[in-house]
From Swiss-Prot:
Organism lineage string: Bacteria, Pseudomonadati, Pseudomonadota, Gammaproteobacteria, Thiotrichales
Gene label: rpmJ
Matches recorded under NCBIfam families: rpmJ_bact (TIGR01022)
Family: Belongs to the bacterial ribosomal protein bL36 family.
BP-aspect Gene Ontology terms: translation
Keyword Lipoprotein in record: no
Keywords: Ribonucleoprotein, Ribosomal protein
Organism domain of life: Bacteria
Keyword Transmembrane helix recorded: no
Single GO term (MF): structural constituent of ribosome
UniProt feature coiled coil, ranges: none
SUPFAM superfamilies: Ribosomal protein L36
Taxonomic source organism: Francisella tularensis subsp. mediasiatica (strain FSC147)
Cellular compartments per GO CC: cytoplasm; ribonucleoprotein complex; ribosome
Protein name, per record: Large ribosomal subunit protein bL36
Length: 37
């Protein structure tokens, strides 16, 4: 899980979702998981 100021899609499998006001990226590749913080 990467914590970043700006979350971006890193590949075509990445999805940007909002979970209780936290922006997250979920992906098939676990190295691409991110959250904004």
């Amino acid at each position: 899980m990467k914590v970043r100021a700006s979350v971006k899609k890193m590949c075509r499998n990445c999805k940007v979702i909002k979970r209780n006001r936290v922006v997250r990226v979920i992906c098939a590749d676990p190295r691409h998981k991110q959250r904004q913080g």
